[in-house]
Amino acid sequence: MHIHILGICGTFMGGLAALAREKGHEVTGCDTGVYPPMSDQLRALGIELVQGYGADQLAIAPDIFVVGNVVSRALTADGSPRYPLMEAILDAGVPYTSGPQWLAEHVLQGRHVLAVAGTHGKTTTTAMLAWILEAAGMQPGFLVGGVPMNFDLSARLGSMAPGACFVIEADEYDTAFFDKRSKFVHYRPRTLVLNNLEFDHADIFDDLPAIERQFHHLLRTVPGKGPHGSGRVVVNGLEESLARVLHAGCWSEVRSFGAAMSDYTAQGEPERFQVLLRGEPVGQVSWPLTGNHNQLNALAAIAAAEHVGVSPAAAAQALGRFQNVRRRMEVRGRVALRGTTGSEASVTVYDDFAHHPTAIRTTLDGLRRKLGPQARILALFEPRSNTMKLGAVKAQLPWSLEQADLVFCHAGGLGWNAREALIPLGTKADVADSIEELLRQVMAAARPGDHIVCMSNGGFGGIHLKLLADLQTWREPTPNRATPS
């Protein structure tokens, strides 16, 4: 089969392309923007990419077009179609489908699907779960919205034996312009992790109850008792929104984690903790990851893995070798700077995918906990997600950035006033309308020993490499801005 993927450079569609290629299908695709790590993966697979969505791609004549949810029937300012290829597909009456539907029909059928859903932590928890099963010798397939460093790829088929495990990141975003259901309703999981739930995706959801309804639609697809064993729902016991989802109706076995009375709890610091099952120690995790959020992610992954026969002790031991996911507090580089006093210390540049206030706060809280109160943290963020661009959560930004010593916001193209939104942060916040201006602001403020965290769900204009290059020629400027006490 030859498939041509529209929107191939998205994390989900890029992973789907990798799976299709591994199954022996011919894969081509098109998109308008390419950035690592997905671009690296596609090039390594030898998948031919076409720039843009020109109607002439109809001549490629694949067996089916697989349409990503980036594609719409929207028009440009001059009234022409924004996606001419999609219009040509519709006019010609040739076969097309959505990514989630193709995945369900060609990859997931006959597999034990373990799905990880939630507003935050999906990618990391999915990667943890896949690694636990891999360490147990189960050769799971997986599709992750990032690149787990234990595997160095975002998707693989894994064992194709009947009932073999497939771990998938289950996104609540809509499937396609012609199928407005959440992607995850296509996956039919037997094991479902519900990590957390708050308002997001303001471009397609009106409010939190609208998202809760989609999560309940997902819950309805998990089996109860059956010939192949019960389905299981692993749920964060700290989340009121998830409690409401379960209260609306649940037909499966439930295992909770996180809260004091949950089935799975943790005792100890996030970097080294005991795993308790109903109060009894069943394993210990010791790893370099930081933050309470990763402790919760670990409990969720352990509870899900236990459903397919991996003991909590074995799962906890495997997590000790977990290497995280690219763009989750990934260190992109360190540059040694020498100040006027002669002291020398490295500036560390991090890359993180945080793009929602809760995720931003979680990221910075974890780093502050690791570094201590004396370290200087410079937070650079780009309000790039649709929810951020609409300003739906802008009031939470000052709260999310409290742990940073200095804050730099790339506000180019926003429909709301970022300077006004960040007023509660006082003089420690700067706003720039371009990447170049942002770089100048950061370089003027940088000092030996700083930790610079770049947060975006996109490429952020390649700011990480630009920063590292500029830091190589850094000279300490005349002080013009003090870190607030």
Regions of interest found by a model, annotated:
Residues 44-51, 95-101, 144-151, 170-178, ...:
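Short gly/ser/thr-rich secondary-structure transition/capping motifs
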Residues 1-50, 61, 91, 216, ...:
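ATP-dependent carboxylate-amine ligase
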